[in-house]
């Protein structure tokens, strides 16, 4: 199965609507970056993901360090990823990193990076 995983920071205070918007930013950013990339493997994964109903899993990380560590692992494995920074117009300071999106990619590649995290 091909899936997308969004990792949300649980150490910062965000309302439910704010958190939902940040998760949406991560998902949309990932899809746009794949469409605009020249990576044929990523595009194959995107097409499979779309055909499979766009499975998304949202999990939580306890710190910014966890987000950075997992983004580096995704980068090392050449997986699509996006780090979302808040614009700072409502609840958070500008530039606050709120979440990390990884995928769409095969679950056997994503699970070693995010499989230990708890569902949000």
From Swiss-Prot:
Q: Does this UniProt record's set of keywords contain Cytoplasm? A: yes
The UniProt entry's GO biological process terms, in alphabetical order, are:
translation
State one molecular function term (GO).
peptidyl-tRNA hydrolase activity
Reaction catalysis annotation:
an N-acyl-L-alpha-aminoacyl-tRNA + H2O = an N-acyl-L-amino acid + a tRNA + H(+)
Q: Which Gene3D superfamilies match?
A: Bit1 (3.40.1490.10)
The EC number of this protein is 3.1.1.29
Q: What class of enzyme is it?
A: hydrolase
The record's section on InterPro entries has: Pep_tRNA_hydro_II_dom_sf, Pept_tRNA_hydro_arch, PTH2
GO CC, one annotated term: cytosol
Localization per record: Cytoplasm
Which keywords appear in this protein's UniProt record, sorted alphabetically? Cytoplasm, Hydrolase
Main localization is cytoplasm
Question: In terms of domain of life, where is this protein from?
Answer: Archaea
Any Pfam family from its record, for instance, is PTH2
Query: Which HAMAP family does this entry report, sorted A to Z?
Result: Pept_tRNA_hydro_arch
- Which family does this protein fall into? Belongs to the PTH2 family.
Q: What does this protein do?
A: The natural substrate for this enzyme may be peptidyl-tRNAs which drop off the ribosome during protein synthesis.
State the name under which the record lists this protein. Answer: Peptidyl-tRNA hydrolase
User: Origin organism of this chain?
Assistant: Saccharolobus islandicus (strain L.S.2.15 / Lassen #1) (Sulfolobus islandicus)
């Amino acid at each position: 199965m091909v899936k997308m995983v969004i990792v949300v920071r649980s150490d910062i205070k965000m309302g439910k609507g704010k958190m939902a918007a940040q998760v949406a930013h991560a998902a949309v950013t990932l899809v746009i970056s794949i469409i605009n990339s020249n990576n044929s493997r990523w595009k194959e994964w995107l097409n499979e993901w779309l055909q499979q109903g766009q499975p998304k899993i949202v999990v939580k990380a306890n710190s910014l360090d966890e987000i950075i560590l997992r983004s580096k692992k995704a980068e090392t494995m050449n997986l699509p990823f996006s780090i979302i920074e808040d614009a700072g117009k409502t609840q958070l300071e500008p530039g606050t990193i709120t979440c990390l999106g990884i995928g769409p990619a095969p679950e056997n590649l994503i699970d070693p990076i995010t499989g230990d995290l708890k569902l949000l």
